[in-house]
């Protein structure tokens, strides 16, 4: 481990859009908002406090309340990026995607499947590998319709279908 407390090959970078640290694997190019497993948290906190304090400047977004949420995304051919880890070229229509998202919403709200399990299998977002977990975020960090829906939920609640330029989402707020 380096003085960052991160296991090799992880490093700390600063997100220009969110003005906060994130964790980057130099071998796999994976990025995480939360520290990877086997991180020495005390060393990481010390590193961030001592080395990165000047790099991260407070912004209105970083001082706003934060929430944690998971989601499941159903993309369609008109989505902002009509591809996913499951399909290189998504061909379903917008209406087909909406109906599929509504079906997933019913499954989640009936309790027959968890967000984690359904997102891992069905979500078109790269967060699927984490069960749809998005980590912590504040205002002005997500697309407005998504953010408004997520912040309106109480912890544990599941949203209806939310449309953004990415596709159709079902969101579950955790905290």
UniProtKB/Swiss-Prot annotation:
One Pfam family per UniProt: Rotamase
Specify whether Amino-acid biosynthesis is a keyword of the entry: no
Which molecular function GO terms apply here? chromatin-protein adaptor activity; peptidyl-prolyl cis-trans isomerase activity
Instruction: Name all WW domain ranges.
Output: 4-38
Where is it found, in Gene Ontology cellular component terms?
cytosol; nucleus
The record's annotation in SMART domains points to: WW (SM00456)
Q: Where in the cell is it found?
A: Nucleus
The reply on keyword rRNA processing is no
GO biological process terms, alphabetically, are: cell division; co-transcriptional mRNA 3'-end processing, cleavage and polyadenylation pathway; positive regulation of transcription initiation by RNA polymerase II
Q: Which reaction does it catalyse?
A: [protein]-peptidylproline (omega=180) = [protein]-peptidylproline (omega=0)
Domain PpiC: start-end pairs: 64-175
Which positions carry the signal peptide feature in this UniProt record?
Answer: none
- Entry keywords, A to Z: Cell cycle, Cell division, Isomerase, Mitosis, Nucleus, Rotamase
Question: Its Enzyme Commission number?
Answer: 5.2.1.8
Q: Which domain of life is it from?
A: Eukaryota
Describe the task this protein carries out.
Has a role in the G1/S stage transition of mitosis where it is involved in the dephosphorylation of cdc25 and wee1.
The name under which this protein is listed is Peptidyl-prolyl cis-trans isomerase pin1
Gene source species: Schizosaccharomyces pombe (strain 972 / ATCC 24843)
Q: Which gene encodes it?
A: pin1
């Amino acid at each position: 481990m380096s003085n960052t407390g991160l296991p090799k090959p992880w490093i700390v970078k600063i997100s220009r859009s969110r003005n906060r640290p994130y964790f980057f694997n130099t071998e796999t190019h994976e990025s995480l908002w939360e520290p990877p497993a086997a991180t020495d948290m005390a060393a990481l906190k010390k590193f961030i406090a001592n080395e990165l304090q000047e790099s991260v400047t407070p912004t209105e977004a970083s001082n706003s309340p934060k929430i944690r949420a998971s989601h499941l995304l159903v993309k369609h051919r008109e989505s902002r990026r009509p591809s996913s880890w499951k399909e290189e070229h998504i061909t379903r229509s917008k209406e087909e995607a909406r109906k599929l998202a509504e079906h997933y919403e019913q499954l989640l709200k009936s309790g027959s499947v968890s967000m984690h399990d359904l997102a891992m299998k069905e979500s078109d977002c790269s967060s699927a590998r984490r069960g749809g977990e998005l980590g912590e975020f504040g205002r002005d960090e997500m697309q407005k319709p998504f953010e408004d829906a997520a912040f309106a939920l109480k912890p544990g609640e599941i949203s209806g279908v939310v449309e953004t330029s990415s596709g159709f989402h079902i969101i579950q707020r955790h905290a």
